């Protein structure tokens, strides 16, 4: 692999793309340190330390700590991620958007433009909501019109700029720009998480016990990463045979292919959906200045917080995990139904003279695909749940408050593998052996 890296840097085009990507990521991290004029940067740092829930910790992990620091990139690329998911969902409900999706490159350009507009709109709404919800509570010490406008414009412009950076990386760099920016944000929190793990499990122990704890933590991380790699790479290939037919005086067709169905078809989307919905009540309560009492509402909010699940002192809060698990399985089926349509696949196969050996074309093929799909979706959802549960157990049972969870690992591994594949394809074009063949 290291030899391949050296070979990659020998190719001017690939080397330029890697350097371009690196420079853009440096800009992202530098921008994360630029403060917004007119805000109290210590407000969220103090506020986070007093919160019992982890709703905003989930959000802050995706921003690389920019939200807690209240930099100009506080909203980061989360509005873009949200708008992309919204547009994907609307393609089913709105026929015009569905036509654009199927209209090749021209249609994709139109959808991209719509996603940009929705991103800016969401960023503006989130900025206004943040100013209204936290401004008078101390985030903006001097609530003048100029300060309010400055904060709203800074947050919106920062999110729009990061969207532009992501698109430039996709166009001129390596990998998917938005995904790489998200990965770097998550990785930027790793040093603080390592410090937390050290102070929680290793520092208070003797040398022998501390070493054992370090080995166990490392083993858990390695096992989790391996599970994610297996989950991302696992596929079920459905064999497809095409009937022979006469074209003029020649017999054509008869070739065979396959339909690769990924076990984790929905990717990390079910986890993001489930985590976002579980966090929503706590976020609303925070904007309203509520949720820190001892009433039934506060207990419900604590039950929805991941850091309270598997708590040895309050096992009843683990009911929140049951709801979380059900939501992940539900969204795995829901999102896969959007991205893969067995009816459409079966119909296209029938039109092209294709069939699955042993299965009749048409409705039987559709039923067979649905049966296989339902099975592998369930396996993929359980795999996602296992990966996400491991860090949650550490947080709840041992009180290790870390942001580097299963969602983060899934995103990082997925982005790394996808970027390596892209570099691999460029290397193969130039007759070099690539990463994935070693």
Model-derived segments and spans:
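N-terminal cationic and glycine-rich segments that engage phosphates or anionic surfaces
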Residues: 1-101, 105-438
């Amino acid at each position: 692999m290291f030899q391949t890296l050296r070979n990659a840097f020998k190719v001017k085009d690939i080397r330029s793309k890697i350097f371009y990507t690196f420079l853009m990521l440096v800009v992202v991290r530098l921008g994360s340190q630029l403060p917004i004029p007119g805000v109290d940067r210590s407000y969220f740092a103090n506020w986070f330390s007093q919160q019992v829930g982890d709703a905003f910790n989930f959000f802050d992990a995706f921003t690389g700590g920019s939200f807690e620091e209240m930099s100009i990139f506080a909203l980061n690329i989360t509005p873009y991620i949200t708008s992309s998911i919204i547009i994907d969902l609307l393609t089913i409900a709105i026929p015009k958007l569905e036509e654009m999706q199927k209209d090749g490159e021209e249609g994709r350009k139109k959808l991209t433009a719509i996603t940009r507009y929705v991103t800016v709109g969401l960023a503006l709404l989130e900025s206004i909501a943040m100013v209204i919800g936290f401004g008078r509570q101390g985030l903006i010490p001097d609530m003048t019109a100029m300060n309010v406008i400055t904060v709203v414009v800074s947050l919106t412009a920062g999110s729009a700029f990061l969207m532009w950076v992501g698109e430039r990386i996709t166009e001129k760099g390596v990998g998917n720009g938005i995904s790489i920016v998200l990965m770097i944000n998550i990785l930027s929190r790793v040093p603080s998480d390592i410090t937390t793990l050290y102070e929680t499990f290793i520092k208070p122990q003797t040398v022998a016990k501390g070493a054992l704890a370090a080995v166990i933590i490392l083993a858990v991380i390695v096992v989790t990463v391996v599970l994610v790699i297996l989950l991302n790479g696992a596929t079920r290939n459905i064999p497809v045979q095409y009937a022979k037919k006469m074209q003029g005086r020649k017999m054509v067709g008869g070739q065979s292919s396959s339909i690769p169905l990924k076990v984790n078809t929905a990717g990390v989307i079910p986890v993001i959906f489930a985590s976002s919905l579980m966090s929503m009540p706590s976020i609303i309560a925070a904007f309203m200045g509520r949720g820190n009492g001892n009433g039934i509402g506060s207990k419900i909010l604590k039950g929805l917080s991941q850091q309270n699940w598997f708590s040895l002192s309050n096992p009843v809060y683990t009911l929140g995990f049951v709801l979380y698990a059900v939501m992940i399985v539900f969204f795995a089926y829901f999102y896969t139904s959007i991205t893969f349509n067995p009816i459409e696949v079966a119909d296209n196969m029938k039109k092209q003279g294709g069939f699955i050996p042993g299965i009749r074309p048409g409705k039987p093929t559709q039923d067979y695909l649905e049966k296989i799909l339902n099975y592998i979706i369930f396996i993929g959802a359980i795999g996602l749940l296992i990966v996400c549960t491991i860090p949650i157990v550490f947080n709840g049972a041992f009180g290790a408050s870390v942001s580097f969870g299963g969602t983060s690992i899934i995103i990082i591994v997925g982005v790394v593998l996808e970027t390596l594949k892209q570099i691999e394809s460029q290397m193969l074009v130039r007759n070099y052996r690539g990463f994935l063949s070693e």
